[in-house]
Amino acid sequence: MLVLLLALPGCAFDKFTPPPVSPVLIANARPDHADPQTLSRGRAIFVSRCLECHTLPAVTKHSPGEWPHLVSRMSGRANLSAGEQAAIVAYLRAASLTGR
């Protein structure tokens, strides 16, 4: 029974929590010209669409430059629009700098 529970997709068993949209995260988003609404949307989509299928490492595990490729690669599985991808990338790029 325990093995079955651990194998369920969509169950997050690690301790990773995506960082909130904070003043520091907003400041880190300046190179992407992302506003707080875009960052909040990106975080919400990340939580609802990415974390529903699998757990992810802390956002700091990847550099800001790696996130566009990673999101693009996974976007087909999550059926993400170009706008959703852009919001997620903006959030993850800023978040990856926030925790460093």
Residue ranges and their predicted role:
Residues 39-41, 55-78:
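Gly/Gly-Pro-rich "capping" loops immediately C-terminal to redox-active cysteine motifs
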Residues 47-56, 88:
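The canonical Cys-X-X-Cys-His
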Residues 1-4:
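Sec-dependent signal peptide recognition
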Residues 12-14:
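Bacterial signal peptide processing site
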Residues 78-100:
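C-terminal capping alpha-helices of c-type cytochrome domains
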Residues 7-10:
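C-terminal motif of bacterial Sec signal peptides marking the signal peptidase cleavage site
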Residues 17-44:
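Electrostatic cytochrome c docking/interface patches
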Residues 38-47, 60, 83, 99:
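Short sequence/structural segments immediately N-terminal
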